[in-house]
Amino acid sequence: MADKDEAATRGNDWEVVSLTASAYAAAPGPKPVVDSKDDDHKEVTPCYEAETSHPLYMSRHFVFPPTGQLENTSDLTEASLTGSHCKEGSDLSLKGLDLSDDFGGLEFSEDKGKKEENIYTTAMSSLDDERAIGGSHVYEPVEEPTEPVSPSDVTLDLNPIKDDEVANSPPSEEAWWKRSVASLIAQAKETNTVWSICIAAAVMGIVILGQHWQQERWQILQQKWESSIGNEKAGRLMGPISRLKQAFVGGQRRDSFIRASAQNDR
């Protein structure tokens, strides 16, 4: 039963292939390519490999025109020779179409497998060349060195309950005394800083007051000295004036005494 099913499916597939082949064969293909470098303007017939679906390729629907700038005259002559050979092969395949069509799928799959193998081998060879050029560098994951665990670490990890008990236990007397002494020292330092600031401020105030007192004293002494100088100058001026006054007063007294004595004589 399986053989019959495979034969039926193969027949159906071949009917589809034959219909598409006849449709492409009936359709007109593109015009032949003419080489611009050739003097005789000969047609260049591209070479096709003889395959089971030959009418599809002979219909010239899958033709890629060759680039005239890169091909030489020797390539053109080889293409013409191989083209004639391909035509003869195509006639033979068309004549024996009934015999070759049964094994067309196998040949196509084999060719496809060979092409894939060729692509894979070329890719691997290119990778090998790149490694040979760039140098074979093998990158391996670097593993961090594991340090040996000391027994003390193990004991610390195995006894977390003891650590919790030590943390929750009340502080000892020595620790309390140390803390109290440290707090007193810190307070003394703070008070020392405060007292030093107060003493410095007091000294600065005393210095400023002393400067003001000295300035006022100098001003008072200057005023006294100026007043004494003025008194001396005034005394010096008033001395002769007082003498003149006394002399004038004494002369008047003498005149009055002379007049009185003169009247008495009369």
Curated annotation (Swiss-Prot):
Source species, domain of life: Eukaryota
Membrane-spanning parts: 191-210
Subcellular localization(s) per the UniProt record: Endoplasmic reticulum membrane; Membrane
Motif AIM (Atg8-family-interacting motif) location, chain numbering: 14-17, 218-221
Mode of membrane association: Single-pass membrane protein
Keywords: Autophagy, Endoplasmic reticulum, Membrane, Protein transport, Stress response, Transmembrane, Transmembrane helix, Transport
One Gene Ontology cellular component annotation held by this UniProt entry: endoplasmic reticulum membrane
Biological processes per GO annotation: autophagy; protein transport
Leftover remarks: Plants silencing ATI1 and ATI2 display decreased ability of seed germination in presence of exogenous abscisic acid (ABA).
Subunit structure and binding partners: Interacts with ATG8F.
Function: May be involved in salt stress-induced vesicle-to-vacuole trafficking pathway. Through its interaction with ATG8F, may enable delivery of the vesicle bodies to the vacuole by an autophagic pathway. Plays a role in seed germination in response to exogenous abscisic acid (ABA) treatment.
Protein name: ATG8-interacting protein 2
The organism of origin for this protein: Arabidopsis thaliana (Mouse-ear cress)
